[in-house]
Amino acid sequence: MVMVKKNGSMNLIISIMILTLCSTRIAADGFIPESFSPPLLISGDDFVLEPLGPRLVEIDYIAYMSSIEHLQRTFSRGGSWPNDSITREDAMIDMQTEQGRFEARESFAYAVLDLDREVELGCVYVYPSKKRGFDAMVRLWVTAAEYENGFDEKLYEWSKNWLENDWPFSPTRVAFPGRDISWEKWDLLSEKSD
């Protein structure tokens, strides 16, 4: 995810540096076991998941830029992502950052693609939880067109099953804030201590 204000290239670089530092500390605490290999290409019913990276920059950019208002209402808590000032250059930096986090086992961002892997329908993000009582926090979004087709709920249900069956987390320790727990309740949970 890229959060950039107008003329915000420096803000983007600073945000990426801060997020990288924060996620590196969390990764050191053992987000996933060393023995676990994060899935690389996952088949759903009528879609596939592939880790975000430079290969997907164009279709990822097209997907979220086609749904700016929808994603600001349904995904971005602050309403600042995506926005029309994001450039393809910003998008490439984001893809490289997501790929780096995946390879470092800090967080796992996946594009949700059609079966031909040419159109992005949305994304799924698996992050370490900063809240007590949870090991992972999962966020997801779908494009406005896919939302209208009912794919948002389908992807959410599929993702819950996928995390339960294919990841090393107890189902009771995976949170989908804004879905299975309200953002208000999530925000009130205690942070994990340093």
Regions found by a protein language model. Name each.
Residues V2-I13:
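Bacterial N-terminal signal peptides that target proteins for export
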Residues M3, I26-A27:
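Residue-level detector of intrinsically disordered, flexible termini
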Residues C22-S23:
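N-terminal signal peptide c-region/cleavage motif recognized by signal peptidases
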Residues A28-E146, W158, W162, D166-D194:
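GNAT-family acyltransferases
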Residues G150-W158:
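Conserved acetyl-CoA pyrophosphate-binding loop and the N-cap/start of the following alpha-helix
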